[in-house]
Amino acid sequence: MLLGVNIDHIATVRNARGTTYPSPVEAALVAETHGADLITMHLREDRRHIKDADVFAVKNAIRTRLNLEMALTEEMLENALKVMPEDVCIVPEKRQEITTEGGLDVLAQQEKIAGFTKILTDAGIRVSLFIDADDRQIQAAYDVGAPVIELHTGAYADAHSHAEQMKQFERIQNGAHYASDLGLVVNAGHGLTIHNVTPIAQILAIRELNIGHSLIAQALFLGLPEAVRQMKEAMFRARLLP
């Protein structure tokens, strides 16, 4: 199983004081060295954390691959075609939200998403759609030609009871298997921590997890190398469990 380390909140800390540190590039390189299989960055329309220059700098520095999260806008499409990341993950975006609140509604935007997917695919960029574990959305993702989906794990991570968490887990597990049966590559992420990652990592249909906020928070106490190492180890151990 692959680990994508999201470095958005390295930029959040930097921007809080308007300094040049901590460096997203340095964070990306440290994460790679200690187990990250790819680097994920979300260039939001309001540029609240990652800036345009960060994306270019990280793309040019890393040895693994860049997964660029972006909204379904012409501006972001143009940016992606300039940066040429290995992967683009199209996500829903609202300016007022603190973080991404739900999955992309592919059903409501099939024509536009299909168009973006073709343009990016023709440019050699693999397209992923960040969606809820809903069979209708998964089918729509397949229909528009996206080869990859990322299942939104936020409801699982934010569940206030074990029963609710198990309900959300089963939804993700069923969605992952449904998507895999369609031939889609299945990733997952949002709200995952060292404490809740094990059940999700046990779902064999899921190929990759993208984890950011909790990992950067752990890095404040453990250091980024150890935070990445512990997360990768937790994922690895989960795959060994019966």
Swiss-Prot record:
An example of a Pfam family matching this protein is PdxJ
The residues annotated as site (Transition state stabilizer) are: 150
Q: Which gene encodes it?
A: pdxJ
Catalytic residues in the record: 42, 69, 190
* Subcellular localization(s) per the UniProt record: Cytoplasm
Q: Does the keyword Transferase apply?
A: yes
Where do the annotations place 3-amino-2-oxopropyl phosphate binding?
6, 17, 191, 212-213
Q: What is this protein called?
A: Pyridoxine 5'-phosphate synthase
Q: Which reaction does it catalyse?
A: 3-amino-2-oxopropyl phosphate + 1-deoxy-D-xylulose 5-phosphate = pyridoxine 5'-phosphate + phosphate + 2 H2O + H(+)
Name its GO BP terms in alphabetical order. Answer: pyridoxine biosynthetic process
Which family does the entry's similarity section mention? Belongs to the PNP synthase family.
- Recorded source organism is Neisseria meningitidis serogroup C (strain 053442)
One cellular-component annotation, GO:
cytosol
Per UniProt, subunit arrangement is:
Homooctamer; tetramer of dimers.
